[in-house]
């Protein structure tokens, strides 16, 4: 089993303390991170894959330090942004799915095999040559997730993956995340979405104020917000 460790992590931007002395270990398969806007949750997950580096303390993924092993960690930790338009870089679905794989220095045959596999897995075969900008919000998000899954990281971070979606597409993305073999760490405001997770971290003013199973954590979060 893999492990993500935060050891006395503080994150400061100017005079603003975004995270304060966070020490935690993550080992569960489905972990939700919730809290009010500005509570530090997005900064927390961005520290995991090295999108940000801690001002103080250490973050490690399976023993690799984010400050010293950035390249290895980027291969181990995938990241899905809230808005798929910030992630999809090429105009056609197949081109975009192939883009990240080519950065792994795979052969043409290996790239094609992985793209074919992921298109079939998520029932996207008919969209192979479609223009991404013509897809629905849910389809775009599925393409963005597919691109990350195809790279076979050990962990995938999702930053508000259902915020921009209607109910039907929320259910689709929820199912996709539930069926992942990788560890999923999900930032979300959607409490219904995270009810079946293994663990929930509640952030407030840069600190983890609740760390428990969903039933307990969500109840306490609602109490604090009321």
Swiss-Prot record:
It is found in: Cell inner membrane. It is a peripheral membrane protein. Residues 4-222 form the ABC transporter domain. Pfam families: ABC_tran. Keywords: ATP-binding, Cell inner membrane, Cell membrane, Membrane, Nucleotide-binding, Translocase, Transport. InterPro entries: AAA+_ATPase, ABC_transporter-like_ATP-bd, ABC_transporter-like_CS, ABC_transpr_CbiO/EcfA_su, ECF_ABC_transporter_ATP-bd, P-loop_NTPase. SUPFAM superfamilies: P-loop containing nucleoside triphosphate hydrolases. ATP binds at residues 35-42. Its main location: membrane. The keyword Cell membrane applies. Belongs to the ABC transporter superfamily. PANTHER family: ENERGY-COUPLING FACTOR TRANSPORTER ATP-BINDING PROTEIN ECFA1, HEAVY METAL TRANSPORTER. This is Putative ABC transporter ATP-binding protein BH02760. The lineage of its organism: Bacteria, Pseudomonadati, Pseudomonadota, Alphaproteobacteria, Hyphomicrobiales.
């Amino acid at each position: 089993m893999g492990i993500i460790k935060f050891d006395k992590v503080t994150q400061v931007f100017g005079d603003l303390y975004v995270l304060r002395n966070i020490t935690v270990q993550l080992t569960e398969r489905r972990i939700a991170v919730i809290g009010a806007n500005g509570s530090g949750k997005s900064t927390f997950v961005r520290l995991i894959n090295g999108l940000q580096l801690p001002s103080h303390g250490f973050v490690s993924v399976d023993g690799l330090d984010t400050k010293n092993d950035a390249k290895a960690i980027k291969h181990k930790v995938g990241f899905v942004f809230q808005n798929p338009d910030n992630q999809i870089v090429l105009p056609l679905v197949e081109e975009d799915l192939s883009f990240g794989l080519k950065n792994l220095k795979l052969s043409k045959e290996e790239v094609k095999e992985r793209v074919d596999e992921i298109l079939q897995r998520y029932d996207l075969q008919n969209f192979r040559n479609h223009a991404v900008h013509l897809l629905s919000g849910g389809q775009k998000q599925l393409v963005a997730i597919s691109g990350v899954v195809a790279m076979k990281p050990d962990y995938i971070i999702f930053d508000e993956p259902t915020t921009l979606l209607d109910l039907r597409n929320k259910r689709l993305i929820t199912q996709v995340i539930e069926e992942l073999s990788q560890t999923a760490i999900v930032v979300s405001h959607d409490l219904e979405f995270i009810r079946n997770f293994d663990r929930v971290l509640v952030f407030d003013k840069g600190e983890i104020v609740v760390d428990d199973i969903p039933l307990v954590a969500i109840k306490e979060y609602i109490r604090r917000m009321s």
